[in-house]
Swiss-Prot record:
A Pfam family recorded for this sequence: PsaD
The protein's name in its UniProt record: Photosystem I reaction center subunit II, chloroplastic
Superkingdom as given in the UniProt entry: Eukaryota
Gene Ontology annotations for the cellular component aspect, listed alphabetically: chloroplast thylakoid membrane; photosystem I reaction center
Job description of the protein: PsaD can form complexes with ferredoxin and ferredoxin-oxidoreductase in photosystem I (PS I) reaction center. PSAD may encode the ferredoxin-docking protein.
Family: Belongs to the PsaD family.
Record localization: Plastid, Chloroplast thylakoid membrane
Sequence segments annotated as region (Disordered): 52-78
Swiss-Prot/TrEMBL keywords: Chloroplast, Membrane, Photosynthesis, Photosystem I, Plastid, Thylakoid, Transit peptide
Record's keyword annotation contains Isomerase: no
Presequence extent in this chain: 1-50
Length: 208
């Protein structure tokens, strides 16, 4: 009995706290109908998708008077080469590949743009390449070292042949009186406008 009395001195009596919450009442504000916004009269304009005018097909400029683009002969023999030109890539089946032709006065060894060396035949030669840049590299080598003129073409998968270079029959390193200059500015680079002067104008310093 004494132990129970002693325990009761250190143990606080358990009492259920009284609920202080007020009874719930439905709020008229939370369920009130929302105020209707003032309707502004707006004119609905039908949206019409304006079809952009398709750019006109870029028509190739005709060759200058007196110049006839040479025709490609597919039966022209290829140089003697034991290696590989790297193939025509997959794009040749769906886009195009390039063919360079030249005529050599004798049989001689030359460097291939794809690596290695080959023997050009005496007379006409034809070489298929995957890139236009390879044709330009080989053509520059033919003219600088062997003094041989060249032509190259673009061949499409459907068999269509397009003559590319030299477009007007005169190589670009030569002066052609009838050729129009592209992007020419007859001034030194030091006389260009300052870059800050053309900022946000959509132009470049060499355009002004």
């Amino acid at each position: 009995m004494a132990m129970a009395t002693q325990a009761s001195l250190f143990t606080p009596p358990l009492s259920v706290p009284k609920s202080t919450t007020a009874p719930w009442k439905q709020s008229l504000v939370s369920f009130s109908t929302p105020k209707q916004l003032k309707s502004t009269v707006s004119v609905t304009r039908p949206i019409r998708a304006m079809a952009e005018e398709a750019p006109a097909a870029t028509e190739e400029k005709p060759a200058p008077a007196g110049f006839t683009p040479p025709q490609l002969d597919p039966n022209t023999p290829s140089p003697i080469f034991g290696g590989s030109t790297g193939g025509l890539l997959r794009k040749a089946q769906v886009e195009e590949f390039y063919v360079i032709t030249w005529e050599s006065p004798k049989e001689q060894i030359f460097e291939m743009p794809t690596g290695g060396a080959a023997i050009m035949r005496q007379g006409p030669n034809l070489l298929k390449l995957a890139r236009k840049e390879q044709c330009l590299a080989l053509g520059t080598r033919l003219r600088s070292k062997y003094k041989i003129n060249y032509q190259f073409y673009r061949v499409f998968p459907n068999g269509e042949v397009q003559y590319l270079h030299p477009k007007d029959g005169v190589y670009p390193e030569k002066v052609n009186p009838g050729r129009e200059g592209v992007g020419q500015n007859f001034r030194s680079i030091g006389k260009n406008k300052s870059a800050i002067e053309v900022k946000f104008t959509g132009k470049q310093v060499y355009d002004i």
